[in-house]
Amino acid sequence: MNSIEFPLLDQTTKNSVISTTLNDLSNWSRLSSLWPLLYGTSCCFIEFASLIGSRFDFDRYGLVPRSSPRQADLILTAGTVTMKMAPSLVRLYEQMPEPKYVIAMGACTITGGMFSTDSYSTVRGVDKLIPVDVYLPGCPPKPEAIIDAITKLRKKISREIYENQMSSQRENRCFTTNHKFHIGYSTHTGNYGQELFYQLPSTSEIPSDTFF
């Protein structure tokens, strides 16, 4: 059997009692139950049609495509990501429960592809928006390469510790930002195209029932 199909064993007794850690057992249980969210935008996504057939047998890895990010733990991005689609992609990623993983499929997803030089509306790499676990280059990648990327992700899951993954994701860049709101009063100057000037009131002028 493959080494990634079983949790790491700490100790084995003569009575066939196996002891291991809770993290290893959790990682092992997730290996055969990855539920991907397929985020395809262009031609690379057509290669998934070959995986569904009997020749490559997409289901043998326990992959069940989901239409809701709240039921998925893997998002597979394939195709060009534009600036207008970036907030939607980040929102889908943030709605996925922990632990979650990302596979970037295709040259357009990884670097922007042929649109990376002179396009004003293309994201130069999906890793600028969400953290990526496995990069899958190609234009488009073959179905065998997709299976190899899934195998590499399964090996990564079998060796990782949940706490380490949580700390590493907090260090990655993210598209969303924390906004700070202040109460202010606008002063119109009467000139067209001129910005509003805001004056912060003193604390005595703020009502006691105001919430931030």
UniProtKB/Swiss-Prot annotation:
Q: What are its E.C. numbers?
A: 7.1.1.-
Q: How does it sit in the membrane?
A: Peripheral membrane protein
What GO terms fall under cellular component here? chloroplast thylakoid membrane; respiratory chain complex I
Q: Where is the signal peptide?
A: none
Record has Chloroplast as a keyword = yes
Q: Which InterPro entries match?
A: NADH_UbQ_OxRdtase-like_20kDa (IPR006137), NADH_UQ_OxRdtase_20Kd_su (IPR006138)
User: For this protein, what is any one GO molecular function term?
Assistant: iron ion binding
Question: What Pfam families would the database entry show?
Answer: Oxidored_q6
Q: What's its catalytic activity?
A: a plastoquinone + NADH + (n+1) H(+)(in) = a plastoquinol + NAD(+) + n H(+)(out); a plastoquinone + NADPH + (n+1) H(+)(in) = a plastoquinol + NADP(+) + n H(+)(out)
Q: Which SUPFAM superfamilies match?
A: HydA/Nqo6-like
Cite the cofactor comment: Binds 1 [4Fe-4S] cluster.
Q: Where in the cell is it found?
A: Plastid, Chloroplast thylakoid membrane
Quaternary organization: NDH is composed of at least 16 different subunits, 5 of which are encoded in the nucleus.
Q: What is this protein called?
A: NAD(P)H-quinone oxidoreductase subunit K, chloroplastic
Naturally occurring in which organism (per UniProt): Glycine max
